[in-house]
């Protein structure tokens, strides 16, 4: 077996959890140094007023609806932004396609900032006019985040719910087509920072 097809036990665990549960949580997917670098870049663009108010719908059919979501986003260009993040994501996509024939052909990611009082109500990540999103991904970049700060990701899983605390370097993958979810209101003056996006098929 060539090096390109060697079994990666870390990726295998992610895939196994995802296939069993419809989601997977990895607590330290990014190192402290990597999140520091990404957070610095995010804050640079946020301070330069490059972020825009979030919308519902896909990028071709957006509508502002502040009662549903009111975070701020900055779309990432892989050739210019978040290089340490994309290096890891691309490695995982390559492995996923080779071992599971997942058919991931493209991706889209943005930085997301949730100031105090912001939220994203219960929703699903696919659209009536576009169902190419397959795997949703959220990666957290806050250096410090206490439980009293709010901003948890809440997944609706069959007969139960799961609230995920946004700790630094944690990544969550879940099924874009089936898992409803929401971001609970941020209760602190500290902004909730993340990279959020989707792996997509044709």
Regions found by a protein language model. Give the residues of each.
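A short coil-to-beta-strand element that immediately follows conserved catalytic motifs
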Residues: 102-110, 149
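Non-heme Fe(II)/2-oxoglutarate
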Residues: 2-99
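Short, conserved, surface-exposed binding loops centered on an aromatic residue
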Residues: 98-104, 126-131
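Short acidic/glycine-rich loop or secondary-structure boundary segments that cap or lie
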Residues: 105, 119-121, 147
């Amino acid at each position: 077996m060539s090096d390109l097809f060697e079994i990666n036990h870390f990726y295998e665990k992610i895939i196994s959890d995802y296939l069993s549960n419809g989601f997977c949580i990895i607590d330290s997917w990014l190192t402290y140094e990597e999140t520091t670098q990404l957070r610095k870049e995010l804050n640079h663009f946020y301070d330069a007023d490059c972020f825009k108010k979030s919308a519902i719908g896909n990028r071709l059919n957006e509508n502002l609806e502040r009662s549903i979501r009111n975070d701020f986003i900055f779309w990432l260009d892989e050739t210019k932004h978040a290089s340490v993040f994309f290096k890891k994501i691309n490695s995982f996509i390559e492995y996923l396609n080779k071992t599971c024939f997942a058919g991931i052909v493209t991706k889209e990611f943005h930085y997301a900032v949730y100031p105090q009082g912001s939220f994203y109500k219960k929703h699903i990540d696919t659209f009536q006019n576009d169902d190419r999103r397959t795997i949703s991904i959220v990666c957290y970049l806050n250096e410090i985040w206490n439980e009293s700060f709010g901003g948890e990701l809440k997944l609706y899983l069959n007969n139960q719910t799961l609230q995920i605390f946004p700790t630094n370097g944690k990544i969550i993958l879940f099924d874009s087509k089936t898992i409803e979810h929401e971001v609970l209101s941020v209760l602190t003056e500290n902004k909730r920072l993340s990279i959020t996006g989707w792996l997509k098929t044709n």
